[in-house]
Amino acid sequence: MDADDSHMDSDDSHTQPDETGAEPPAQAAKPASATVRARRARVAGGRRGAPAPRPRPSPAPVDAATEQPKKSRAGRNLPAAIAVAVALAGLIIATLFLYRPSFAIVVGLAVAYGSYELAKAFATADRHLSLAPIAVGGVAMIAAAWERGTNGLAVALLLTVVAVLVWRVADGAHHFSADAGASVFVVLYLPALAAFAVLLAHPSDGAARVIAFIATVACSDTGGYATGVLFGRHPMAPIVSKAKTWEGFAGSVLFCSVAGVLFLTLTFHEAWWKGVLFGLGIVVTATLGDLGESMIKRDLEIKDMGNLLPGHGGIMDRLDSLLPCAAVAYLLLTAFAPVA
């Protein structure tokens, strides 16, 4: 019973007849409170059907100048990525066939800028690299590999590591282990591995060797990307990279095996099974390189190493699989197709 009704009953119970014995006229019902009126309105509305919803305002028009470029299902700006890849491929082919020493120059520039990207990335985690000796020593390692081969590379690598440690000593003992360890890691990861691409290019058939190496790595990326987007269902390493799937890896294996057989049989005139092994070695190394780069970026809590290359990120985002594959390609091609 509502409070208004109980109050009304209380008034009626205390009403006494007048002197003539007649009952007094009944009091007029008090107006319903706002709460009661709202409740009655809801009940009535429920009986008659819910009122029509209010029209939603139309979204504001998107300015074509500020609209973001559409991305592919894999999260990349595919047209920009293809354009950059074609431009880089044209640059590499030009250096290999017009003036091969210029290929070493391009690799040296990539090492110097990649060192800068890595220094910025590691700085976000309060790990400060010895950038100057890494960049200068890295370029020296590329030059030594071109001029003196593996022996020159080994000497330049040793001197660069010593220079990195001495440079860091000048900054004091605070975080020395973390900074020095990160700096030595970068020396081994970037210029030391990039130097193997220069070693591939140095022989008389170096252009063919570099193209076989880069094209097979590209087949790994393309095969994994295409099959992963179309058929990818089972993540390979979800903790490290959600984009890697076993279906994509199978596509990489297929594409790399075919590319390896074609290059080893048609270009180097070797047995087909050597091409299969070459392709398998490249695809496994490229996949591990991608995952390793993803681990580094997760550790540093960054998405990309930079933004120099539209659709790819930074230089290091493009070199993630090429760097370790350069060393593997050099070893396998030296074993399977020795220089005459």
Model-derived features: positions:
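Hydrophobic transmembrane alpha-helices of multi-pass small-molecule transporters
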Residues: C256-S257, R318, C325, T334
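Membrane-embedded alpha-helical segments of transport systems
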Residues: S220-G223, A250-G251, M316-A326
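Membrane-embedded alpha-helical bundles of polytopic integral membrane proteins
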Residues: D2-D5, H14-A22, A28-V43, R47-G49, ...
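Interfacial loop-to-transmembrane junctions
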Residues: D299-L322
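Juxtamembrane boundary at the C-terminal end of a transmembrane helix
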Residues: L331-A340
